[in-house]
Every structure is written in structure tokens, then in C-alpha cells.
Amino acid sequence: MAQSKHVYFFGDGKADGRTDMKDLLGGKGANLAEMTNIGLPVPAGFTITTEVCTYFYAHDKTYPKDLKAQVEAALAAVGRITGKKFGDAQNPLLVSVRSGARASMPGMMDTVLNLGLNDMTVEAVAEKSGDRRFAQDSYRRFITMYSNVVLGIEHHHFEEILDDHKDRHGYSLDTDLNADDWAQIIVRYKERVEEESGKPFPQDPHDQLWGAIGAVFGSWMIQRAITYRRLHNIPESWGTAVNVQAMVFGNMGETSATGVAFTRNPSTGEKKLYGEFLINAQGEDVVAGIRTPQEITEEARRESGSDKPSMEKAMPEAFAELKRIHAALEKHYRDMQDLEFTVEQGKLWMLQTRNGKRTAKAALRIAVELANEKLISRQEAVTRIEPGSLDQLLHPTIDPAAERKIFVSGLPASPGAACGEIVFSPDEAELLKSQGHKVILVRVETSPEDIHGMHAAEGILTTRGGMTSHAAVVARGMGKPCVSGAGSLRVDYRAQTMTAGGTTLKKGEILTIDGSTGQVLVGKVPMTQPALAGEFATLMQWADAARKLKVRANADTPADARAAVKFGAEGIGLCRTEHMFFDEDRIRAVREMILAGDEAARRVALAKLLPMQRKDFAELFEIMGALPVTIRLLDPPLHEFLPHGEEEIAEVAKAMGADPKALEDRARELHEFNPMLGFRGCRLAIAYPEIAEMQARAIFEAAVEVSRKTRKPVVPEIMVPLIATKAELDLVKERIDAVAKMVAAETKSPVKYQVGTMIELPRAALKAGEIAETAEFFSFGTNDLTQTAFGISRDDAASFLNIYTARGILPSDPFVSIDREGVGELIRIATERGRKVRKDIKLGIGGEHGGDPSSVMFCAEVGLDYVSCSPFRVPIARLAAAQAALAQRHKKA
């Protein structure tokens, strides 16, 4: 039986692997092979495959039986190319051992350099190089790294010894130490290793090698790597490869160096060689921050004001070679590259290339410029941008150079940064805003009653609630930064203070919140403003040309509608009319309606609301022009509009001239144990049809008014919420149709409109065929459909959902990304049954899922006509919809 190939060699212009073998060789191994194949100077070496890592964990941390022989053969081949021999006393081959997963995981797993050094080979290296200091310096580095990575001995043990030696000899820098100093330190290092591990430092290079290989495979399961994988959705099953490579030394004197470079600026995307290097150093010195790195280009040196020479000046030949290679690599990989290199006695060697990590701003510029340079197509440019990353570009962000004094941290619930005075009451937020102040609203949690304060605030901070809490959803809808669930924060409404970590801040003090990271910062922190022109606009045009799915916005106010148009929305997919009722001048009329003893009294109160609603709808229709507007009839339970607590009830009763007891009794009467499943949605319209009639009249009169004014047809879409049966929809539609006839007769204008429903209950999804006989459109209310399908309250789920996702019970938070198997199945069933009965039925989703890239992809697969999301997430949905369309085309091809 043929043995499996576990080891892939590269060196001397030939390699067993290729760049498309990342799954087997990891990103680093595949790219080392590719660079070798295209003729770049890469030190010879070999890659042990990711399959060995999988075997290692499946077989109690042992290796396939034929691995050892393959490693020995590859080591011998590296020796032939370099003219050295591993473990040889006269001319030893030294190697590096590095990890390399499929997906780039910078700094997450372990590396060992200078492996093969021992008490004997260090003398041979000193003699061959003619530099004893270099040899001893390399050996002490190896002992430190190997002891930490393989033997588990903390760095501080070695740092203490080094600092003690420097103090006793009056040295300030590592470069002050000579060969004898390092030799003395090495003796102490080895003594410390034996003290800590109970064994002498290993002297056999082969034992060292297998120890390092095992440690690199072992590092796949260290905590920081596990955390990184979870944050970046990298499966544990992928495993890592191990790369063993002949050492080249950047610490062999003034003609040697080590560095890291990017082919374009990773922060801005500018097409310039960007990076840092250090003369007479090894790779870890650049990232460790022990010495200040030098600039690669002379231009960058001038900009930074550094007096240290650039690589361009200090090493002109190596710099010219690096420039040639960086251009060749970018052309070959058709993307911005992150390079690691070493210069050994004037010769440049490439140690790594990979697609470079970049900011969203840089990613946009790089994708558009690569397409303009004809290196990639426009469609490929569209697929290169992570839709969720656009969040970084649509809100002000904290200046990366700014100092951060962190007060407390919570969840990054709504992106962007905001700064203002601390306030604890929504009323005060509104008052101070009217006086020209900028405020941050701090609440334990928010409710619909706080909406005016949230609207007035620059940003919102809550101590309770998750990423899909009321505060988070409303803040995202408004495009306001929000940090939620800051559990260690204590808010005292009475004292008007907030306390975290022993620090107390008072009302009126300045606070900055970063909704992109969840950090809450003391004082005013500098910010950068978003720009939506240039590359952003170009890429959005390319995305729009590729997508089929329409993108609408959820908008409840004229400001929302204007933002929706600005971000490219193709209509309003959800206008929640209840948000219009919380303004101070309206809430009183709403409360009068709720307190009314009979229908006649309710109609009197509703008559006061009619002109206000009509004005709201007219403004929305005017802003949106010919684009569709879907208006949802009143949905929340009535008790949400009433005051809570004795003090507030007394205050409201006095302002209304009502009896406090009557108000208190009515509030108690309307109180529900489970309001989410209670007296709300179409149930209100059936029990109190006059509410739906008033709203329908306001919609139709506004449509007629705007149609006359603009001389363009306005066709509103009226959505009936929370229906479970066709009979419910039929009843409410009868009332809407009756009002439409009346308005048409009164205005002598035909009234065109559509009536549809929100599918947010499992029964409605299952009976979609029947419901489609009446409904002209369905909008899937995925927030409530998820709650009712799972039997989970969204506002209470934060306490346990993270446990579910961490343990793999659920792949992700179903309130963030649609649960394809359950909720998704209900959407699929409703789509099929609805279309069977009414071929031209319009289908979309409202709610926050409409702005989640994974959910948008699902909507495209199911064949919905549109998604609707908060205005600030519209560009994200547009890009995700384009990527979904391109993926479907690719699948068909």
C-alpha cells in the first residue's frame, strides 16, 4: 500500500506544493511553495500537512508511523541545498519551526527560531560566521523561545536574568552586550530551565525538532487561538500545518536585517510600499517593541521625522530587490500582500507572503484600484469586501491615534462613536438637545417610552440587554452608536451617578462611547467622520449592477427616510407607526384614547391624532417619491403608552385633568403577563377597529395630497401585523377597503393601495397559502418569528444565548442571523405556499435580519423580492445582496 504524503518540500526553485493547496499546507506553507515555484529567493524547507494535525488530535497526540522517515528525508534535502547538515558539529543546519493555518491567524500560534543550536553547534556557528557574539545571541534567543513554546516556561524567568545582568554591568540596551555577556547569560538560562522543568535543556537537535513540531500542533488548541477562531468563524477541524525552514539570519551584523512590509498601506489602501525593518535583528524584535523599527522607504522616514536611516538608504540593493519582489507578488496574487523578509549579509530572503489584513477603508480602495488596474474584475472587487465591515465607514469612528481611557466595556450593539454629556432621563436628553447640548443617554435598559430621548441623544449606553435588545435594535435603526449590556456598570437614577471599577461619574460629565468595540471612555476623544463618495460610491454602483434582491429601509420618521434615500434604499419596507405616537404632543391624545370609556370617546381622541399621522405619512411619501412605502398598523400593546409608577401616573393624570385612580386602574387592567403574545397587532385592530380606520384614513388622505402636489401616483402598502388566521386579515382589510372608498368619494380622487401582512407567527407561515388569497404582499417579521418559533424572549435571551453558541447548541445567535433550519424553513414554506396561490405576491423581510449579510444571502436563495433594514445598514445589505447574486451565478456556471 502506498504511503500517505505528509511532508511537502520546497527549495532551489522547485516545490511539491502550490498556492491552491492551503487546505493541506496552510496559508504559509502554500505561499512558501508558490514563491519558490515563481523563482523568488525562499530559504529551503518543508511543510508538515494539516492532516497530520488532525491525526495528532485524533490519536492521543501521536504521529502517523511514516512521518518520521519523511521528515528525515526532507531535512537531508534542505541540507544538500544549503551545504549544511542538521546536528553536524562542524557545519550545522539551523531551522525555524512555524505554524501555518488555512486562514491567517497573525500572532495566534507559536514559533521557534534558531533550532539546532546546542553547546556544541553554537561554537561551530561562531567559527563559520566569524562572529561569536552573533552565535551566542542566536543561542540565547533559541533557549528563550524553545523553553517558552515547548517547555512551558514563562518569558519573565529569562527577562529577570537578562535585566539583572544589564543592571549589574550598567547596560541599557541588548545591543550593548558582547559575546561573553551572552555566554554568561546562557549558563544562567540553562540553570533556570532545569530548575523550572526538572530536566536539562535538550541538546539533541532531533529531540528539539520533534519537541517544537509537537508544540506547534499543540498551539492550535491554546486559549488565544481558540478565541481567535471563534471570533473569526474558523473551524477547529481545519488544524494547522507546521513549516520547517532553513534559518537565514538578520542578526549577523550591520549588513543583515529583518522586516515586515505591505505592498499597499493597510490603513488607507494607498499604493505604496509600507512597513518597517531593523538592522542586525531577528523577526521577533520587530514586533516585540524592544527597539524602535526603522522605515523601509526614504519618503516614509521623512514623514515620520525619524533620524534613523531607511532601508532604501542603508541597504539600496536589498531594497531594490524587495521593490521588484513586492510588485511581482501583488501581480501574481492579485491582492495586497503582507511580506516578511530577512536580509542576511546583504542577500534578501522571503519568509512569508499572505493577503494582508486591512481596514474597511483600505479594503474598499484596494478592491476598486485593483479592478481599475485590470488585475481583478469589478465583480471580484465586489466579492472582496466583507459587507459587515462597511459599518466602520458609515459612522464617525474614534481616531486610531487617540488615547483611550476606558471607564467600562459592554457589547458593541450599534457601531460608530459618540460623545456628550451624561444624562439619565429621556426627557432631560430631549430638553438638553433642544438647548444645543450633545448628550449620551445612560439607562439600565430602554423601552419604547424612551424613544424621544434616544432620538435626542448622540449615543446610548445600557447596563442590561444584548446585541438584539430594544436599545440595540432601535439605536441601529436610528444610526446611533450604542453600547449595551455593560453589566459591571451601576446606575443610580436617584443620585444621578454611574459607577464602574471604583470610579463614579455624575450627570453632566463628558463621556465617549465606541459602539464598534463596546468601550466606554472618559472625556472627549477625537473622532474621524465618514465619507461616502469616492471608492465607496464606485463599489456600491458595481454591487447594484450585480444584485437582484431589492433593498428597502425601516424608517419611522422623515429623518430616517432621508437617511434611507442617502444610503441607496429602494423604498421603505417597514414604517412602525407606534414610534410616531411617543412625541409629547401626541402621547396625550393616545392616552385619552386608551382611557376612553366607549367608542365615541375613543373616536374623539383619535380625531386629534388624525392630522398628525396624515402629516407624518405625507412627509414620508414626499421624501420617497415614487418608491414603495410599507406602513405597519399599530402593533404594540396599549399599556406601553401609559405611565408606570405612582409618581408618573399622578403627574400624567394632573397634566391630562384625569382621575389618577382611573388612570392607575386602566394601567393595571391593561397589564399583561406576556405582552409579546398578548393584546397587540391585528388583535387591537379587531377589538378597536376605529384605530385602524384612523390610520388608514391618514394614509389615504396623505397619499392623495402628495399625489396631487407631485403629480405622481402614490401607492401605499398597508401591513396588518401579527395575524395568525386568514379571517383576522379579512376583517381588518374590510375596514381598510371601506375607508378607502370613503376617502375616494370625499376627495374625488381614486385611491390606489395594497394590503398585506407581516408573517411573524409559525401558524401564519404554515397557512400562507390561505392568507395569500387576501394578502397582496408578505413581509416576514423575523424578529417575532424567531421569538415564537424558538419560544425565546429576545430581550431576555442575552443571559443564556451566548452559552448556547459557545457550546455549539446553536451555530449563531438566531436574532442576529436567521436560523436557516427552523425559522428559515418556515419562511421557505410560506414563500412556496404563498406564491402557489398568488403568483405576483411580493415577498420581503423586515427587522434587523435584513441588514445581516448571512441572512441576506439566505433571502436571495429563497427567492424573496426584497430585504428591509435600518437605514445605516442599507449599504451592507446592498453589498451582501450583490455577493449572493454572484455566488448563485457562480454555482450555476
Predicted regions and their residues:
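A short, small-residue-rich loop immediately preceding and capping a beta-strand
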Residues: 458-464, 482, 844
